[in-house]
Amino acid sequence: NEAGLATVPWCETKEEIPNEWKQIVARATLVGHSGAGITIHTTPTDLPTVSLYTKYVKKTYECRIHIFKGRMIDAQIKRKVRDVEENNPLIRNIHTGWVYCRDNYIPDPTSIQLAIDAVRVVGLDFGAVDLIYNQHYNQFYILECNTAPGLEGTTLINYVNAFIGDLN
């Protein structure tokens, strides 16, 4: 990408999709939550016309790092918390039994810096960056930078403390 940050490979039209992409994620909406509008396809012929296509990158794990003014204020890892009948096991969201948890998760310094850089590049003071880690390539990839992450519990307290600290 233009900023030099590691994102999953992406494009905006079907015609741009490289032949070597074995699985393609189609994102029907760029504004949403919980995986709304995401479908995964194995051939370009069955693709809907959408705003964004990405290569499906296999993940060892997924995490969310919350950044405020250039520093991490919270971090979570996505865990399967309940079994449900999944339509597509490649999509990890609340509907398929996956949620962000703390579980004493300590993020890798590389992922923290990538999240800091992502928030800075998009020009935000704060944001929650969703990342995946691929063990085979020993690589983190940015999935998205959330400008209005769901805030509750400890995460909400961490944001409140960050904002109060910034005012003092």
Please provide the spans of the model-predicted regions.
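Hydrophobic residue at the +6 position relative to the catalytic HRD Asp in the kinase catalytic loop
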Residues: V129-L131
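Short, internal acidic amphipathic alpha-helical interface segments
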Residues: P107-D125
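Short, surface-exposed beta-strand-loop junctions and turns on beta-sheet-rich folds
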Residues: R71-M72, K80-R82, A148-P149
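C-terminal active-site "lid" helix and adjoining low-complexity regulatory extension at the edge
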Residues: R120-L124, Y133-N168
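Histidine/lysine/aspartate-rich catalytic loop segments that bind and position anionic ligands
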Residues: A75-I94
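Active-site nucleotide/adenylate-binding loops and adjacent lid/helix of ATP-dependent enzymes
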Residues: N1-D74, C101, Y105-Q113, D166-N168
